[in-house]
Amino acid sequence: MAVFFRALKACYEATGDERIPAALEKHFLSYPPQDRNSVRWIINVEGILWTYAITGNEALLQLAESEWLRSNSALTQENCLDDNNFNMHGVTMNEELKVPVLLYAYTGKPQYLQAALKADKKMEDANMLVDGVVSSSEYLAGQDALASHETCDITDYSWTMGYFLMATGDASWADRIERCMFNAAP
């Protein structure tokens, strides 16, 4: 659903069809709690927050925050802030890294920005390759000369850096996107 949301978002932006945010609102608010336990469910926070921005329904904002704080995903508020390196699927890392910075953008709560910035630093310090994308041959793979990454890491990393740019207004995030796209994109 998280990636499908992007297609719906694009359709809404092109057409203004109000049925789209209404359907997403209904979907997210009626999604059974027992079905929100998959590791990658947390990526849906992107769509939940976008839908909140369109509808103004505070229940969506509350859902996004509560899902992040109770998440059983590999990236959590707690491990974003600790000093341990991440050992997780690289594409999932690139996708989930946007969640705390999006929560900061929508709530203004500094603890989310702090988590996002520290998680990004930890990820990049241990895994950034010369072409501007973190290594990931399935899992984060360090900075070995033979380390590589998958094509989906390129798109997911640049997409997430776009949210860092929007949330902070700091142009260094645009530099990261440019480096990634000019050096690593096919």
Question: Which residue stretches match the model-derived regions?
Answer:
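Glycan-recognition and catalytic cores of secretory/periplasmic carbohydrate-active enzymes
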Residues: 1-186
